[in-house]
Amino acid sequence: MISLLMQNSAGLMSIGLADGDQLLFDSVVDVDLAGSRNVEAYVRAAFSQSGKTISEVDCVFVDIGPGGLGATRTTVAFANALGFANSISVIGIHAFELIGYEVAKLTKKPVVCIRPAARPNHYMALYDQGNLSHFSFVDIDTVQLFVRGHQHTASFAGKFSFSEVLEAKEGPWPTPVANSASMSSFLVVALEKYKTGARTSRVYPISENLVVNSQ
């Protein structure tokens, strides 16, 4: 199976192309793409450097956030357009599954995933043994309580900083290990999702149209 992998919710574009469980292209190692935000340029590079064509792609996997909404929407729209124009299945993957897997692989611990939303709110979830739970859109007090409740048993992924908040007696806030997944990690998650996930022609980015939960 030829897979096109698209990740951008952290605001850093990365594209991969794989044949089965073997990566054929990873944009991270292409210095000519460094700093570019042109999704089409990344996809063209993936095909030109791998020798593959869009007609050979069996599935497009795209990071649907949560994260930077503009970047995520752009990449999801491009994935949907590719799928529609070429009759290719599109599968959306939760960004917290990607960064959760990445950090769990490195630390061998459950992972609390956090990213900022519209101030002062945050997205948060717990990734543990391949499962994502507690995903919610919360206020700052709730996310801080969640962090304190897990800081001795979990690792952290995403992007957050509570430095403006006075340190409590519990000590300093933990630091996220990573805010994006390597393309090899993305591929592992994608292939597992392919076995169980719904294959559609259109996916949607995770937005802030959620009820804010407060403590």
What do the predicted segments below correspond to?
Residues 38-41, 77, 81, 98, ...:
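Short amphipathic alpha-helical face segments that pack within enzyme cores
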